[in-house]
């Protein structure tokens, strides 16, 4: 079955906000269980999966910096929030009998493994889902940056960016009902038009390494597997 798959190894970027469901803060476990179920569907189809989680449901370093906190310190706190989310997601996934490992860019030996590239790849080869926490381990970098870097390091075929909308638009569709959706768009146009998909430096890294990105809504159950199978609603960013 694996031989017929377009993408055999993927990295899924899940924002912290996606784990909140309709709440204003923290975790909605029904929502997380649905996401875990979608990931299981993908694994059962024969796809190797890695995940990068954000931390915005708990803490946003950039917002704290705006009110006077030292930006580097704020970003480190945000990285710790991603570890909380990774451990939460791991526990929910393991309740569905999905074998997982959490690897953190910030060493926390008593709660998860340190990020070591070869170890992470070995886990994936053994059929385990690897959840990357701690961002890149450096301040002033987004978890989107971590997602692109880890996807490249893991030799993933595609980055799946799960968002609150069903693709990339020329303006915010929540504010502009006439916003135009792109079904495919190249990296250059994302950068030139300053589309707020992810930070532009990260898009440039994806472009340099020819990493395709698919942007889709995580709200629709079953959407992750659909996007990998060229079904459902999404936008593809590639050369």
Curated annotation (Swiss-Prot):
Regulation: Inhibited by UTP.
Signal sequence range: none
SUPFAM superfamilies: Carbamate kinase-like
Keyword Lyase: no
Superkingdom assignment: Bacteria
The EC number(s) this enzyme carries: 2.7.4.22
Catalyzed chemical reaction(s): UMP + ATP = UDP + ADP
One example of a Gene Ontology biological process annotation: 'de novo' CTP biosynthetic process
Record text on subunit structure and interactions: Homohexamer.
NCBIfam families registered for this protein in UniProt: pyrH_bact
Protein's name according to its UniProt entry: Uridylate kinase
Organism: Rickettsia bellii (strain RML369-C)
């Amino acid at each position: 079955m694996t031989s017929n798959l377009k993408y055999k190894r993927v990295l899924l970027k899940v924002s912290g906000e996606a784990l909140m469901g309709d709440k204003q803060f923290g975790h909605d476990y029904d929502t997380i269980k649905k996401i875990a179920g979608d990931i299981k569907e993908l694994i059962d189809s024969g796809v190797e999966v890695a995940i990068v989680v954000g931390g915005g449901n708990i803490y946003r370093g950039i917002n704290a910096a705006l009110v006077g906190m030292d930006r580097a310190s704020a970003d480190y706190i945000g990285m710790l929030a991603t570890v909380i989310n990774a451990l939460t997601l791991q526990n929910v996934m393991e309740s569905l009998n999905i074998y997982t490992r959490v690897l953190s860019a910030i060493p926390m030996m008593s709660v998860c493994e340190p990020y070591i590239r070869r170890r992470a790849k070995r886990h994936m080869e053994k059929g385990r889902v690897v959840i990357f926490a701690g961002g890149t381990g450096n301040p002033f970098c987004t978890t989107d940056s971590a997602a692109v870097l880890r996807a490249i390091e893991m030799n993933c075929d595609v980055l799946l960016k799960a968002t609150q909308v069903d693709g990339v638009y020329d303006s915010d569709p929540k504010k502009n009902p006439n916003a135009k959706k792109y079904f495919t768009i190249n990296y250059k146009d994302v950068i030139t038009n300053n589309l707020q998909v992810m930070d532009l430096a990260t898009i440039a890294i994806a472009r340099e390494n020819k990493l395709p990105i698919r942007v889709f809504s995580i709200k629709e159950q079953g959407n992750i597997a659909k996007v990998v199978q060229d079904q459902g609603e999404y936008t593809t960013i590639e050369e």
